[in-house]
Amino acid sequence: MNYGLTHTPSLTMSECLVLGVFSDLALPDFATAIDNEQKGLIKKLCQRVPEPGNTVWQTDVEGHSLLIIQCGKKEEFSANSLQKRVGEITEALIKQRFSSATVCLPRLNQESAEWQLEQMIVQIDNLRYQLLDFKTKHAKSHKLESVIFHLPGATEKSLEMAKAIVTGVEFCRDLANMPANICTPTYLGEQAISLSKQFDQISCQVMGPEEIKEMGMGALLAVAQGSDQPPRLIDIHYHGNKNSTPVILVGKGITFDSGGLSIKPANAMDEMKYDMSGAASVLGVIKACALLKLPINLIGIIASAENLISGSAVKSGDIVTTMSGQTVEIINTDAEGRLVLADALTYAERYNPDFVIDIATLTGAIIVALGNIATGYMTRDEQLAKSIERAANESQDKVWRMPLDEAYQDALESPLADMINAGFDRSAGSITAACFLSRFTEKYRWAHLDIAGTAWISGKKRNATGRPVPLLIQLLRHVANSR
């Protein structure tokens, strides 16, 4: 996809010129010039779009097309309005099968041109993204391949930053959408190694069952033992500032989750290929950071396995010893994500991080609580909470803080081991899952992102979203600016 900037938009620059207009202001100078050339055509078309979101097309204007979209009154043109207009424009361009467009939308009052450009590119790229296509007997879908923006105040630097972000998001989506027979733990490790070959600032180590066993990662091995696919622990570093204290992202990499012996319902089990979306987001963020050349030290740790059923699969009631030395009674084999994360979070201690954020499609309970709008997050660190909230607001990648009170820890008590891996009932499922993880994070500042509701869209049009890559990149940009 090509994105660019222009100071002098014209009808002939692309297949379609998109012009956003205010109901209470005159046309901008460049639009007035085009209107004069076309003998008042634009002003006539504007009379046919009285309400915000109204659109009107004019085809075959010097062999090109013109789309007018009403943006309402200037003072009422908000970030939310921008999001709606960009969505309507993108869907219209794709429906009309345009390959290129020049988009001229008014500036927001409250935000910088750099922020507005970034949001427009992220949204357009999100809507034009197409699933990996394994079909053999039909023509490939039409693609919108080039969008040029006219946005006074936007710079080439902000354009390149936006392009880096969408590249990271796309990489995350491609990995998450990959079928589980291709995207195995081994494949995830290969993708991490590939990043280290693409960028000099990235190094990577991928560890297999022997190394995992030597480190005492009994929880990760327990989850993996029911599958013929060997587990992987991926340790990937972005060296943007080797002298700074590292930030660590820990990703859940369950490349397929049948639930194990606590088997999931058949309905929508195919979507359990998305249970590695946390891992995909970690790799997407690291790729974007390398493109952005952020001056930070970032480490990604991914615990990857398949959770399947076999004669050797872990059983309900089994007790395992984690890397931390704590023992866990596994009462539910479908609560496997927290098991692999427990060992990965303990592994993170060796780097003495500034803070750690784990990203995981962890619980169905968070979907019941928040749906697919906001990612649920938990932390006991108020400074980290403020940083996450700020990054979420700026990136428009929404979050909602859930409680992490000590009282919830009682739900994890076991008569046989240090803890059970899931509560005996369904109450507060997302919170007790985070409480479980908190027992492995006492040596550093930590936050948990439960992306089970936001990592993908379910149903016939199932598709990975790439979240929370925009949120995490924005957070890391603030970290970079503070050092």
From Swiss-Prot:
Function: Presumably involved in the processing and regular turnover of intracellular proteins. Catalyzes the removal of unsubstituted N-terminal amino acids from various peptides.
Enzyme Commission number: 3.4.11.1, 3.4.11.10
Catalytic activity: Release of an N-terminal amino acid, Xaa-|-Yaa-, in which Xaa is preferably Leu, but may be other amino acids including Pro although not Arg or Lys, and Yaa may be Pro. Amino acid amides and methyl esters are also readily hydrolyzed, but rates on arylamides are exceedingly low; Release of an N-terminal amino acid, preferentially leucine, but not glutamic or aspartic acids
Main location class: cytoplasm
InterPro entries documented for this protein: Leucine_aapep/pepB, Macro_dom-like, Peptidase_M17_C, Peptidase_M17_leu_NH2_pept, Peptidase_M17_N
Organism, as annotated: Legionella pneumophila (strain Corby)
Family: Belongs to the peptidase M17 family.
Gene name of the record: pepA
Designated name of the protein: Probable cytosol aminopeptidase
